[in-house]
Amino acid sequence: MSQQIKLLVGLANPGPEYAKTRHNAGAWVVEELARVHNITLKNEAKFYGLTGRIVMNGQELRLLIPTTFMNLSGKAIAALAKFYQIQPEEIMVAHDELDLPPGIAKFKKGGGHGGHNGLRDTISKLGNNKEFYRLRIGIGHPGHKDKVAGFVLGKAPASEQSLLDATVDESVRCLDILIKDGLSKAQNRLHTFKAE
């Protein structure tokens, strides 16, 4: 059974100084999908972000990387969703995940924000609807909560970045499966993947 996903969002902080930081892992998924489909994301002020449109398995999918700061991501998502009449249940948000190690990613539907400011604002701006899909890109944890801010805004060492890149690539392939064959088939594949 195919899955109706109409909007894929990659959470990020804007600007070149943040582009390669762990907190921007969600945006890497959208950038890779745009690259694979040979489109250029365009800045759209009314949606507070970089946007694009692709067709996957005959289904239109809008792409968004908010250019607000992370803690205001919901403003961009809500603006685009409202304009195109996209329901929260038709949105997939890709984001960095401290609770998964680098090299691992997981799909999830619904749930809380787990302390992630981008997810927190998204839930709030979608009227506290938590039923959107998430693509959680593992970045690992620094070991202590006081180190989290510096960790997510830091760049991964090369050995770790190669795991993140491989995970993003596999996530894009599994997104294709999700749209064509549904969540459980996509989970079956992505959740057994581990970048080496």
UniProtKB/Swiss-Prot annotation:
EC identifiers of the protein? 3.1.1.29
Where is the site described as Stabilizes the basic form of H active site to accept a proton found in this chain?
96
GO terms for biological process? protein quality control for misfolded or incompletely synthesized proteins; rescue of stalled ribosome
The primary location reported for this protein is cytoplasm
Compartments reported by the entry: Cytoplasm
In this chain, the site described as Discriminates between blocked and unblocked aminoacyl-tRNA is at 13
Enumerate the Gene3D superfamilies for this protein.
Answer: Peptidyl-tRNA hydrolase (3.40.50.1470)
Positions binding tRNA in this chain are 18, 69, 71, 117
Q: Which domain of life is it from?
A: Bacteria
Q: Name one GO molecular function term.
A: peptidyl-tRNA hydrolase activity
Provide the family line: Belongs to the PTH family.
Q: Describe the task this protein carries out.
A: Hydrolyzes ribosome-free peptidyl-tRNAs (with 1 or more amino acids incorporated), which drop off the ribosome during protein synthesis, or as a result of ribosome stalling.
> Mind telling me what this protein is named?
Peptidyl-tRNA hydrolase
Q: Which organism does this record belong to?
A: Vibrio vulnificus (strain YJ016)
